[in-house]
Amino acid sequence: MLSTYPPTECGIATFAQSLTKSLEHNGANLNIFRLMNGDQSQSPKQVICEHFGKRDCDQTVEGLNQHDLAIIQHEFGIFDGRDGDEVVSILENIEVPVITVLHTVLSNPTVNQRDIINEIARHSKALVTMTQSGKAKLVANYKVDATKVHVVPHGARPVNQNAKPTSLLPEKTRPRVLTWGLIGPGKGIEWAIAAMHQLKGSEIFPEYVVAGQTHPQVKLRQGESYRNELKRVIHEFGLDEDIHLIDKYLNENELDELIASADLVVLPYDSQEQVTSGVLVEALMAGKPIVATNFPHAREVLFDKSGILVNQKDPHGIAEGIRTIIGSKHRANAMKARMNRKTSSLLWTSIGQRYLEIAHSIKGEKVSDSRQHVAS
């Protein structure tokens, strides 16, 4: 598999690690070709090649070609070159079948971005997107054969519902609203803070927890300007005792403890393009009521009222969503019941099996034929 990979701290790295474990659980042999993306941290043993940029393309391609099949995780920002166009140079020279997982599908790409996706599609045996809306965009806006596109949901691990109380926060004395993940512009945290300001003084006034480090690429370019602006707004609104910013990349145990302590999850993202959210799927798996802005992945997952959708940049809508869930135990329990009907199909073990089925279909084999030797 060619992807960013832990200890790199980003969503795609975490996704790649989870998918790798799931594929291995289902019988595949995997090697990791790690996109370093400016990260100098030491790679785990499973990484057999570190790719720092275009200078490494020949070495990476040579290694990938020694496998039965390659899986490539794609996001414009993780490859070298203009809009990450080095991925095209890699794909042009891969001789084994390729499955490319598209983590972003833009409705209005630049000419260069559209060309890159079209080239990815041309050189891949299969494309994976995680939502039906992603597939629809690919078919409508790009030169992509619909039969080549597979919709496989973002996987999630089981969340420990009985985790001990978190040590990252003071003792809980009122309802807790949670947002987690890497932080940066576009996450919409400022709108959730404004929603908390609207709730202050009302009968329903929870505490709000924002957990996660600043995204490494954001920190590289902008430092902590976004986080500092959030702190300024929190202080201006007089919410210093009501909003907690946890500047930490959480391990699974810490995250489980935090999720278990929450009464609901808020995803206030600005983007109207986001077709994938690992946090959304994890919240769903944990059975936590969700208030989310109206981005594509949320629309698809929460269509059956297993959460509340609000407009982007709408503090009033977020506040009303929080008020509705905390104020109605019946409504919250109904959301949890709807979520529970979806979760088994989202477990990583099930998702890994779906990827193996795609792998065998493009190689013309049945799933039980052999153990795949996959470059991931």
Question: Which stretches of residues belong to each language-model region?
Answer:
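Donor nucleotide-sugar binding/catalytic pocket of nucleotide-sugar-dependent glycosyltransferases
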Residues: 122-161
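Conserved acidic donor-binding segment of nucleotide-sugar-dependent glycosyltransferases
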Residues: 304, 308-315, 324-329
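A conserved mid-protein helix/loop that constitutes part of the nucleotide-sugar donor-binding site
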Residues: 13-14, 184-198, 203, 316
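Nucleotide-activated donor-binding/catalytic signature segment of Leloir-type glycosyltransferases, i.e.
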Residues: 222-249
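Conserved donor-binding/catalytic core segment of Leloir-type glycosyltransferases
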Residues: 169-187, 193-196, 208-211
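Short alpha-helical donor nucleotide-sugar binding micro-motif in glycosyltransferases
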Residues: 121, 256-262
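Short hydrophobic beta-strand element within catalytic cores of glycosyltransferases
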Residues: 265, 285, 289-292
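A charged, aromatic-enriched C-terminal amphipathic alpha-helix characteristic of glycosyltransferases
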Residues: 10, 330-360
